[in-house]
């Protein structure tokens, strides 16, 4: 599907699987406060403007693989009770994952970050995989807690990291 103007899914509650895979959002897209009781698939989405996925609750797996974000994107304050997959994605603007809780494995590997990245005050209960990522701007990841392993193998850091 293509959404040529703003798309507002704020505070939706999906009791079954939610599938937004391969959607193109040309205007601002808002999912703030959404709740997903089953798997949520956003694989392959392209967001050309600002995207807001903040303060969401994912009870099933959350899949954001192979996605492209041209505008700024906000995932802050979200809770992932199962696997969270963000790998193989491209972020051309700032991205905020601050204050997220990951109860299952969190996978961010093989992604490109052109703008600033915030991952402050996150809780990773299980393994977190950031391997082979490229960061071309600042990365702020202070005050985060890792309950499992944190894998940054092969990542490239081009600017200030805290």
Put a short name on every predicted segment.
Residues 1-162:
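N-terminal leader/targeting and pre-domain segments
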């Amino acid at each position: 599907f293509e959404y040529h103007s703003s798309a507002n899914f704020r505070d939706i509650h999906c009791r079954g699987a939610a599938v937004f895979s391969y959607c193109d959002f040309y205007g601002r897209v808002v999912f703030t406060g959404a709740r997903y009781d089953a798997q949520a698939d956003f694989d392959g989405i392209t967001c050309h403007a600002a995207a807001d996925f903040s303060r969401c609750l994912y009870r099933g797996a959350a899949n954001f693989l192979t996605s492209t974000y041209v505008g700024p994107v906000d995932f802050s304050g979200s809770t992932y009770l199962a696997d969270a997959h963000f790998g193989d994605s491209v972020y051309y603007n700032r991205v905020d994952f601050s204050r997220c809780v990951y109860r299952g494995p969190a996978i961010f590997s093989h992604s490109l970050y052109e703008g600033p990245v915030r991952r402050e005050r996150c809780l990773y209960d299980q393994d977190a995989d950031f391997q082979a990522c490229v960061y071309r701007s600042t990365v702020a990841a202070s005050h985060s807690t890792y309950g499992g392993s944190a894998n940054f193998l092969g990542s490239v850091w081009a600017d200030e990291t805290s």
